[in-house]
Amino acid sequence: MIDPYQIVQSRAIGADCILVIMAMLSDTAARELLDTAEEWTMDALVEVHNEDELDRALSLDARLIGINNRDLKTFHTDIETSLALKPKIPAVCHVVAESGLSTSADLMRLANVGISSYLIGESLMRADDVEAATHALLTGVSL
């Protein structure tokens, strides 16, 4: 989302949450999107990739933080990003780990630091059997 009107359009067709990517927005633009989402009673998942973006998101009082483990310059994924940033996030915030999650061990490592929400795309999209892949991911994970 880059224009508040997109939020209004999204709400009109039933959306209840928007994605605000700090890497592509100024603080002013992000604030405008967050305010518009709140005005339209929508949640906002504020996505960060590093500590600088996290600091900016927190300064905007974001409460739903998505930590994207994918480096946008190299497209390399590393869940250490989530593990490193989680302790810097206040307990009042809900954290979603995004990208690079492909095993139940990954989810366990994240769960052990208090992250219990995950955005999993690529590993499931590449799976021949999505149901079996999802079951394998969740086996042994206590959420």
Regions found by a protein language model. Name each.
Residues 84-88, 111, 126-143:
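C-terminal helical cap(s) of enzyme catalytic domains, especially alpha/beta-barrels
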Residues 14, 36-38, 62-65, 83-84, ...:
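Short, hinge-like loop/turn segments at secondary-structure boundaries
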